């Protein structure tokens, strides 16, 4: 008698690329090749095929969830006998440095805004809620940028709380990747969008990740649907090094760049420097603080080589 395979219980439905692609149904492609080029990151070769097979099914799923959420709000308003406030639907996107969170966020912003409902979609990154370099220097945390202790979590939580409370206008600080710092006296104003996409390393973290700064609510408490963009660390490191080399020839050559000195490195020196930064900062942060949040996500997208999505896990 053959022994039965052990049943592995999982809170996720699992799809390979082909299975996920069939869930597109008849959703039309609303992006042109030229628009896609503008949306992709510096180190990513994303194709229209990837948009069709991965992101159109995802935008269809999100549209169902958002419509369901609006119906739930209408039921509550009917019960209370009120008109109610407009409360944005918050989508969180998390994952490692260099995994392509920003491209995923920009793609979803473009696709969701083009559904027939013409919903307004805003995008905010949690980089704006990092402490300024002056504060990080004072606290000896410049080499811990992106780690939990480098964020002004009270301000970030208040921002998301105000968004979900229906505030008519909420402001967020602006971060510059050129100067590697918060831009003084600059704010981005969010005015009750239908959807807010919040992208950052830390959107799935909870209070247990911040023992040094305890508080009762967290960003993840206000996120309606969360996406974790995953990839093996070996790939992440190679993508980071490749991106570093491209920045060395591009953004780092700007005299105003915080990393201007890196533009003078030879290719071998640049590879070694990027590898050291990964080992000492980004890889460490991934293993300690980012990867442990993966299973909190509503959906996990796992990438293989060339940034292509190979599998999707959707929470039941």
From Swiss-Prot:
Residues given in the record as ATP binding sites: 95-102
Signal peptide (from-to): none
Localization (cell): Cytoplasm
EC number(s) on file: 2.7.1.33
Keywords, in A-Z order: ATP-binding, Coenzyme A biosynthesis, Cytoplasm, Kinase, Nucleotide-binding, Transferase
Coiled coil: none
SUPFAM superfamilies membership: P-loop containing nucleoside triphosphate hydrolases
Record field: catalytic activity: (R)-pantothenate + ATP = (R)-4'-phosphopantothenate + ADP + H(+)
One example GO MF annotation: pantothenate kinase activity
Family: Belongs to the prokaryotic pantothenate kinase family.
Protein name in UniProt: Pantothenate kinase
Organism name: Photorhabdus laumondii subsp. laumondii (strain DSM 15139 / CIP 105565 / TT01)
């Amino acid at each position: 008698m053959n022994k039965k395979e052990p049943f592995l219980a999982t809170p996720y439905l699992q799809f390979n690329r082909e299975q996920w692609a069939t869930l597109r149904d008849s959703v039309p492609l609303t992006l042109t090749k030229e628009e896609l080029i503008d949306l992709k990151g510096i180190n990513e070769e994303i194709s229209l095929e990837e948009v069709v097979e991965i992101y159109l099914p995802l935008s269809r799923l999100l549209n169902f969830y958002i419509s369901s959420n609006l119906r739930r709000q209408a039921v509550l308003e009917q019960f209370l006998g009120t008109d109610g406030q407009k409360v944005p639907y918050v989508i969180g996107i998390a994952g490692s440095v260099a995994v392509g969170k920003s491209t995923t966020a920009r793609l979803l912003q473009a696709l969701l805004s083009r559904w027939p409902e013409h919903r307004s979609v805003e995008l905010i990154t949690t980089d704006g809620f990092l402490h300024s370099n002056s504060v990080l220097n004072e606290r000896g945390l410049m080499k811990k940028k992106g780690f939990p202790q480098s964020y002004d979590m009270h301000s970030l939580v208040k921002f998301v709380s105000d968004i979900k409370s229906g505030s008519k206008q909420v402001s967020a600080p602006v971060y510059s990747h050129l100067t590697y710092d918060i831009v003084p006296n600059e704010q981005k104003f969010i005015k009750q969008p239908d959807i807010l996409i919040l992208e950052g390393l830390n959107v799935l973290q909870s209070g247990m990740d911040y023992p040094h700064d305890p508080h009762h609510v967290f960003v993840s408490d206000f996120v309606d649907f969360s996406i974790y963009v995953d990839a093996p660390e070996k790939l992440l490191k190679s993508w980071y090094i490749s991106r570093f080399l491209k920045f060395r020839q591009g953004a780092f050559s700007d005299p105003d760049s915080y990393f201007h000195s890196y533009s003078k490195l030879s290719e071998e020196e640049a590879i070694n420097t990027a590898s050291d930064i990964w080992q000492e900062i980004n890889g460490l942060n991934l293993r300690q603080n980012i990867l442990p949040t993966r299973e909190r996500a509503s959906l996990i997208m796992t990438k293989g080589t060339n940034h292509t999505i190979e599998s999707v896990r959707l929470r039941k």
